[in-house]
Every structure is written in structure tokens, then in C-alpha cells.
Swiss-Prot record:
Gene behind the chain: rplX
Keyword rRNA-binding: yes
Organism: Acidothermus cellulolyticus (strain ATCC 43068 / DSM 8971 / 11B)
GO terms under biological process: translation
Family per similarity comment: Belongs to the universal ribosomal protein uL24 family.
Protein name, UniProt field: Large ribosomal subunit protein uL24
Classification of source organism: Bacteria, Bacillati, Actinomycetota, Actinomycetes, Acidothermales
Amino acid sequence: MAGLKVRKGDTVQVIAGKDRGTKGKVIAAFPREQKLLVEGVNRVRRHTKVTATTRGSKTGGIITKEAPIHVSNVMVVCPECEKPTRLGRRQDVVDASTGKTRPVRICKRCGKEI
């Protein structure tokens, strides 16, 4: 199974599901499950039991937090053209004398490095 093309810190737009059209920043990526945690997307309510903390305060109640969303339901938003795009890969030369290269992600729409 290949790794994810989307990384933590990328801005993505949801293309399918109840939050379709919403843009958000990737908080965490789970490559093994092919899922992402996106800020402000797929918010769910969790009922947590009231428990005492070490300082004596009590925590619990209804908490709203983000749930993971499948990577196929999002597209990366290019920072240059501000539109959802597919990603490509290109080898950029780091050192011409030694021929060292590094892979970079590029926007298929405008061709700029992401």
C-alpha cells in the first residue's frame, strides 16, 4: 500500500459527504487506515463520563471533536491558484555537480510546487 499524497499541514477541500465544499487544514494523517483528521470537518459529539482529575477538578460531558475522513473524499488545495487540484511528483535537482535530486509535489493545474 502506497503512502498518502496528503500531508499534515496541507489545506484540503472536501469533495464528498456531508461536509462537501468545506476547506480545512489537515491536523493528522493515518496512512495505514487511509484517513485524515481535518480541522472543522466531520465533527461528531462524544459523551464522556465525568471523572476527577489529579488536581481535583471534574471533566466530562458532551464534547464536539473531529472524526477521521477517508482520503478519497478530499482534494488538496493549491496555495498558488487557490483551487482544489490533483498532485503530481517531479524530481528537482538539489546539487548539479553530484546529480542529487529530491522529489517534490506539484500542482497538476498550475505546475507550481506545493
